[in-house]
Each structure stands twice: as C-alpha cells, then as structure tokens.
Amino acid sequence: MTENSQQPQPAPSTELPTQYTPAEVEGQLYERWVERGYFEADAKSDKPPYTVVIPPPNVTGSLHLGHAFEHTLIDALTRRKRMQGYETLWQPGMDHAGIATQNVVERELGKEGKSRHDLGREAFVERVWQWKSESGGQISGQMRRLGDAVAWSRERFTMDEGLSQAVQTIFKRLYDDELIYRAERIINWCPRCLTAISDIEVEYQDDDGELVSMKYGEGDETIVVATTRAETMLGDTAVAVHPEDERYKHLVGKLIKLPLTDRSIPVVADEHVDPEFGTGAVKVTPAHDPNDFEIGQRHGLPAIAVMDEHAVITAHGPFQGQDRLEARSAIVAALRAEGRIVAEKRPYVHSVGHCSRCKTTIEPRLSMQWWVKVGPLAKAAGDAVRDGKVKIHPQEMEKRYFDWVDNLHDWCISRQLWWGHRIPVWYGPEGEVVCVGPGEEPPSGEGWYQDSDVLDTWFSSGLWPFSTLGWPEQTESLAKFYPNSVLVTGYDILFFWVARMMMFGLYAMDGTPPFHTIALHGMVRDQNGKKMSKSFGNVVNPLDWMDKYGSDALRFTLARGANPGVDVPIGEDWVQGSRNFANKIWNATRFALMNGATVEGPLPDASRMSSTDRWILSRLNSVVAEVDAYYEDYQFAKLSDALFHFAWDEVFDWYVELSKTTFQAGGEAAEVSKRVLGEVLDVTLRLLHPVVPFVTETLWTTLTGGESVVIAEWPTDSGFRDAGAEREIETVQSVITEVRRFRADQGLQPGQRVPARLTLAGSALAAHEAAVRQLLRLQPEGDAFTATATLPVAGVEVALDLSGVIDFAAERKRLAKDLAAAEKEKAQANAKLGNEAFLAKAPDQVVDKIRGRLAKADEDITRITAQLEKLPEA
C-alpha cells in the first residue's frame, strides 16, 4: 500500500524497555548520526539540491525558545527532503554580533577594572576572539540537544577569513558602482555604546514626557512652538509652518529672535508641517531630528550640533557640560525667567527609541557615516517578489514587504566599534580616499590611515546565503546549493535581514535571488499570549524543558503551534502533553512488537484483509497525501495535528484495540493484521520522524531492523482507498462511542461488565461483534436477560440489562438534583447578564466568566435531561 524503502533485513529485535527515557538515548543517537555523516552535503552529488541556511544566532548568547521553534521547523523540512532523496544542506553558523559581543567583552574587562581603551584596538580584538573560542561552543551544544540535522563540517562564522573576503569584495564592488558613499546625515546614536546603531537595534516604547510651549521672536513678530526636547532649541535654525496656514503667512521669510542665544532664525514654509497639530508651527533642529534634517535640506538650513557623543551640551554658555536631561530642565527655567513659557509642562505620552543593548535613550545625531544607496537594490528586491521569482508564505506578508522595500531610505552601514569587519577604506594626507579590495595592497606611507569604523552586522549577515558557500570564489558548493530552496525566519526580521539578503543576493549573483521561498513564522509567547521577557519573568530556557520531557516533546509542541506568520503560545502543560504522545507511540509500538507486528514480506492482497485492515491502510494513504500537502504549504501545525490524531486516535486507540481480538484468535487473519500493523507503524514512524526524530529512530530501527530512519525513504501515497471500509469502521466507532457515553452517564465503572444483546443480523458490523463486546465490556445476554435500556445507533440496536447494577430510583433522584442546580446557575447568570448597570461597571473578564458559566449550565441541562430520558423507570 505504501512503499518501504528498506531492503530485506535480519529479523529485528522486539525488545524495547518498558518506559521511554529520552535522556538515555537522545545524545547517543545524535552523535551516531553525526559520525555516520548523515547530515553532510556533497556538492558532487547528482541528487537534486535542497538548501536552507540557519538564521545565524548571535555568538554572545544561548538558544532561546524562539531559536528552538525556528530550528524545529527547518529541521523538519530538511529531514523530510533528505528522506525524499534530495542532496540536503542545512548550513550552520553564527553571527559575530558586533555591538552585542563588544558589550559583553567590555563588561568582562570592567570586572578587571579595565576598559577597551586600556588594551588598545588590536589587543581588544584579540581578547574578543579569545572570548569567542571559549564561549561559542554553547550554541552548538544546544543545537545538538535539539536534534538539528546540520552539516557541521560546513559551520561558518561571519568573521571567518572566507566570509571576511566576501564582505570586502562586495563593499569594493558597491563602492566602485557608486552604491556606497560617505555623507553626513542623521543617525540613531547610543550615548552609552558610543556608536551609530541600526533601526532593528532601536526599541521603541511609550514614555511619559512633558510638552512645553514657548515663544520665539520679539514684539509683534512672535511665534509659539511646542516641544518635549527643550534642550535641542539651542540648535534650532528655523521655525517651519505650512505654506497655506493664514496665521503665519505674514511671518514667512522673516527672521525672528531665538531665545537664550544671540541668533535670529528664519520662518520657512514647508508642506511637512501639519497645521492642525499644536500651534501649527514647529521648531527645526536639523542636527538632532531626522524630519528636521530633511526640512533643513530642502531649505538650505545650517545644522548646528549642540551635544557631543555622550549627549552632553557643548559650547552653549551656561548649559555647557550639562547632560541632556539636566539641560532640559535648566533651559525651561531660563525661558520661564524671560517670560517665554506660554504653557507650562503638560503630560505627553510619546514613543521614544532606546538602545536594545543598554536601554539608553537614543539620540538622533548628525554624523559622518558610510551609507548604501539602496534605491536600485531595493527595487530589484521588490521586483523579485512581484515577478514571482520569490514566494512569501503566508502571502499576506507580501504587503508588509513591499511597504518596506518600496519606501526604503539609504542604509547607514558604519559603526563606531572595534569588533567587526573594518571598513576597507584608507585616507591620505591630501584628502585622498582609497577603497581596497581583496588581494589589493592598501596605500602606505606617512599620513595614510584606515577608517576606524566597522560595518553593521547586518551587512555581513546579508551575504550569508552565498558567502557560506565560498563566494566570491566560484566553488562547487556555490554552483550546487545556490540559490537556497527556502528561508525560514521570523516576520520580525523580514525587513532587516531578509530584505538585505535579497538586495545583496540579486546584486552579487547576477540577478539570481538568494532563495525561492520565504516562509515566515511568528514569535513564541507564553501560554497566555504574552511576550516573553526577563522583565515579565516568563522567559523559559528550552534546555529545562528538554531535560524534563525530552527534545521530541518540545519539538512537537512547537511544531503543533506553527501556523504561518502567527505568534505561537506555549506552556509547560503542552510540552508535558507532547511527552505523553511520545510515550503513547512507544507503548503502542512495544505492544505491536510483542504481538508479532512485522514488516517482513510484501503486504497481503486486499482480498485477504479484514475491513479493519483495509480501513487503516486507506486512512494511512490519505494521511500521507495530507501531510505532503501541508509540508508544501509550510503548514506545520496542521501536519503535526494530522499525524497526532492519526497516530493516537486511529492507529493506537482504534486499529490496535479493534485488532486485539484478531490477534488473540490467531490464524491467517491474525498474520495478515500483524503485517498490516507493521506497515502502518513503519510508515507512521517515518512520517513522524522529521518532527520527533529521536523516539522514531529508536522505534523504527527496532521495528524494521533498518540502519536509520534518517536515511529511510519518505512514504508515498499508493492511491489505495477503501471508502466502504471507512464507512463501516466509522459505524463501529459510533456504536462504541455512544455506548461508552451512556455507560459513563450512568456511572458505570470502565471495567464493569454488563449483559447486552447486539442486533447485528445482516449488518456488516456482525464481523466486529467480538471486538465491540470486548471494548465495551459487554457480556452475553443469558437466560434471565431483561432489556432495561435500548440504544439505537447507526442502524444497530444495543440492548443493556442494568438490573442490579444501578439503583434507578436513586440515580433519578441524583440527576434531578443536579438538573435543579444547573437551572439555578443558568437563572443567576442570565440575571446578571441582563442587568445593564452591572454590565456597564463589570470588567470584561468578569462578564466573560459569567458567559462561560451560562454556557456550561446550558450544556449541563442538555446532558442531564438526555440522561433522565434514557434512564429506565424504577
């Protein structure tokens, strides 16, 4: 029915321990896989390639749940493709994480009472490399614990010699093509880290600020502006108003006095100004605000910096040497003394950027930096998606992608750090500027020096899909494995990393995008949907859950929550539930082996099979097709759910249970069912393997005697279906489910046997009577049988004799009491929900709780009423 890829093997061992203990097997299995080279990729292979790069984790850290989530998805994809016969490369590596790594090492130096300046640049960089060699192995160890099937021999680091050559090469090409330039512009500046930082390193949060309105000018020619940053007024070079604002037309083009200074500044008309906001007039500080800088460029305004790199006021009279916050208060006080405060401080909540590393408030600062001219690069990145060369999953994320690449500003790529790829530009004594490519000798002689800045980390990670394959050399690996098949990453870095890879890949690789597909996932959150944060106290170390429940349990939990582009809540209870699933697989396979399940020989002809056998094989092939379709659409949650319910419900809870009487009876039917059970388990374990690799490896090799499920063949849908068998077993399931529900309603113990008469004459269900009786604990009816309850289900009648088993009068009394309680609960809930005054004051969660009580009361009333109707008269 489905192919088993293994050649005939020696009879497998049927011995499995009574319990599955992940800690005893996971580490050994992983090292065995690595030693046998299963995860390595051969560039000379004639197999079709399948390539995925790991989003390189920062060398500074350890894997968090977000990494574990992402790695689980990538691992599932690559394991499946390997089983499908692809030459599969999952490219591992780490990012040098410039500012983060430098901060970590600087803190270590601080404990020794030293700074990086005490060491000097060269010695400090050596110290960082030493730290990297001592700390970098932590992430690799965690990846092994998780089961990542990466090609370890190809592991890369963004500061490796080969990757450094790639960085220098593309910088030189972009520079020569006039796509890299140096200019003075506004950047995000961290006064603590003393560097420009990228947009992604800025965290915005609402801060409680104070809005102050102040009067500029003298006499009849005054204008009022409002600001939360009074300290920057020392650098104002204009006041801007909207050109159509009648209130200020008489002032446009005139000079007005700038308070606290000896300067006068012009009033300019600019359409950027919103005449409806505040007074309709805004102060313009081109050196300390990105929007003001743009206004300044349009009107030829000078840019006056009033703060140094530490955000301290520079040469401006009495405020010189004051921190920006100290100066803010001092300037407001000075303005008040001159009678220029029109409105005192008012509370004002506004979004303020903070450095993601040190949480310091970002200072927009005019600075000479290196930039990438992104216009043509961004257009190519947008067109690649528009033209269908690259697909984004889920498709609705395409709009966000276009919104960004179509409105992209030039990218500041220089950082005032020591750790990173140093900018390959030299300056000469006469103002010469020379960009040096790989293999070229830099200028020498008196007065020549290299730019002291390093490149933004995202610059080198933007080359990751091809630099890891040996570019700029035309290697066999580059020819075989570029472009990547898919990029799996979070939607949060769609703009910052994904788009940069698109721009650089298309530019460096002659218009070939770095990947065919971008599969975006959401963020991992706690079980209440709250963002995981140290400040919230809800951060989970994935190693803790792997130690407690096993790696498979964590992986399966993460995969079951992975809907494309949607955030993933996760709680420990869910991981424990996945561990229960692993135990269920283990116990069911152990039972099957103990009862002779086998994969030896071909499957018997369908004519020799029972309807139960044909049903499970029909369902198996449907699930194979279903899982394949979900994989192709990156629907990890749906494929995991499909496998969970098929394995647990259909195979273990129904097929195995329905087949027990067949096994006990022996004979040809039992032998056929043993072979069918072996086939179903073989295929199910192979289907489950990409998501839960460890437990499936142990069980599959024990069941089949095969070398490893890692290199087994991925199951294919044979096309076998039996709709009749599926309908028949669905009817059996309905009968069993309904009688079980009745037994539970009547308070019968699960193991309590009850006399019963099954009217199955002429029904296809007659063949299942033994199994039905065994599963429902039904005895033969006997001579004294009295039908006290009759259940018609799906054309079958089940009569039960509950005489002496249930005190019907007492049971009716108990149910009547429960019904009265449920009706009272319903009345109370309805009364509260009908009270408008209560609803107006009650918190939403209280109202929701009462609605839940009402729904529960309705369910109880329906259930108890049905039980009373079925209960025989005493």
From Swiss-Prot:
Predominant location category: cytoplasm
EC number: 6.1.1.9
Reaction(s) catalysed (UniProt annotation): tRNA(Val) + L-valine + ATP = L-valyl-tRNA(Val) + AMP + diphosphate
Keyword Aminoacyl-tRNA synthetase: yes
Motif ('HIGH' region): 57-67
Coiled-coil ranges from the UniProt annotation: 805-871
Region (Disordered): 1-22
Stored CDD domains: Anticodon_Ia_Val, ValRS_core
Span(s) of short sequence motif 'KMSKS' region: 531-535
Task of the protein: Catalyzes the attachment of valine to tRNA(Val). As ValRS can inadvertently accommodate and process structurally similar amino acids such as threonine, to avoid such errors, it has a 'posttransfer' editing activity that hydrolyzes mischarged Thr-tRNA(Val) in a tRNA-dependent manner.
Comment on protein domains: ValRS has two distinct active sites: one for aminoacylation and one for editing. The misactivated threonine is translocated from the active site to the editing site.
Similarity comment: family membership: Belongs to the class-I aminoacyl-tRNA synthetase family. ValS type 1 subfamily.
Protein name: Valine--tRNA ligase
Gene source species: Streptomyces coelicolor (strain ATCC BAA-471 / A3(2) / M145)
